[in-house]
């Protein structure tokens, strides 16, 4: 696969699971002889939701909830066929969204 790169984008709500999955992908790629660029942390997306604490009155009493989406990007430069096979067989933790672009 000469001159081709694989870009892997990872998303998760928990940064610890995301980092462990990233380490697993990097070690698998390096073990099969590919060069890895990254992991590059992307900006964390924070969604905030504001709701009333009471269902009836007290408009001034509110509560805020937030959801943080952590993201990482990996580039695998000049992957070998063994690298692609190993990445396809890799079983990552639940809760990690993986996007792969060739």
UniProtKB/Swiss-Prot annotation:
InterPro entries: Ribosomal_uS10, Ribosomal_uS10_CS, Ribosomal_uS10_dom, Ribosomal_uS10_dom_sf. It comes from Methylobacterium nodulans (strain LMG 21967 / CNCM I-2342 / ORS 2060). Coiled coil: none annotated. One of its GO terms (cellular component) is ribosome. GO terms for molecular function: structural constituent of ribosome; tRNA binding. The keyword Ribonucleoprotein applies. Belongs to the universal ribosomal protein uS10 family. This is Small ribosomal subunit protein uS10. Involved in the binding of tRNA to the ribosomes. The lineage of its organism: Bacteria, Pseudomonadati, Pseudomonadota, Alphaproteobacteria, Hyphomicrobiales. Part of the 30S ribosomal subunit. Gene3D superfamilies: Ribosomal protein S10 domain. PANTHER family: 30S RIBOSOMAL PROTEIN S10 FAMILY MEMBER. It comes from the Bacteria. One of its GO terms (biological process) is translation. Keywords: Ribonucleoprotein, Ribosomal protein. It holds the Pfam family Ribosomal_S10.
């Amino acid at each position: 696969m000469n001159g081709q790169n694989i870009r892997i984008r990872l998303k998760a709500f928990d940064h610890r699971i995301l980092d462990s999955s990233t380490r697993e992908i990097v070690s698998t790629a390096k073990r099969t002889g590919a060069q890895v660029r990254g992991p590059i942390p992307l900006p964390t997306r924070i969604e905030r939701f504001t709701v009333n604490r009471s269902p009836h009155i007290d408009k001034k009493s509110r509560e805020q909830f937030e959801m943080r989406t952590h993201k990482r990007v990996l580039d695998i430069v000049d992957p070998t066929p063994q690298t692609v096979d190993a990445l396809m067989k890799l079983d990552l933790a639940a809760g990690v969204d993986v996007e792969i672009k060739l």
